């Protein structure tokens, strides 16, 4: 039960995307991997899941993933600035080089 495991959804709510409808669910599962001394258990995987889903939503909406995120970070200039800087430094929107290892 999520009420018993407060860290289950850790990292899933960290990004403050303005989503008009959002619901998170937790289904407990014993996968046999002890996590007692694993630092940042849920924060190490949940943000990846959230961002992957944001990519899927952007594709479904037919919108560039960076533009989609910026739209849902409205009113959060610091977060928008970080995303814009990451996109610029990562050369987002530029074609990939036609060299081995890039395709």
Per-region residue spans from a language model:
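Short, intrinsically disordered, charge-balanced linker/junction segments flanking boundaries
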Residues: 70, 96-103
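Glycine-rich loop/linker segments at domain edges
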Residues: 1-52
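Structural signature of cysteine-dependent C-C bond-forming condensing enzymes
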Residues: 86-97
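N-terminal leader/propeptide and maturation segments of large enzyme subunits in energy/redox metabolism
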Residues: 30, 34-88
């Amino acid at each position: 039960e999520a009420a018993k495991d407060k860290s289950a959804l850790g990292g899933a709510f960290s990004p403050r995307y303005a989503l008009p409808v959002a619901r998170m669910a937790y289904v407990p599962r014993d996968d046999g991997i002890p996590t007692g001394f694993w630092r940042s258990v849920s924060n190490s995987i949940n943000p990846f899941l959230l961002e992957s889903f944001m990519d899927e939503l952007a594709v479904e909406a037919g919108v560039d993933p960076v533009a989609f995120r910026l739209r849902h970070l409205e009113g959060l200039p610091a977060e928008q600035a970080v995303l814009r800087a990451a996109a610029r430094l990562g050369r987002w929107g530029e074609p990939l080089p036609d060299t081995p290892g890039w395709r």
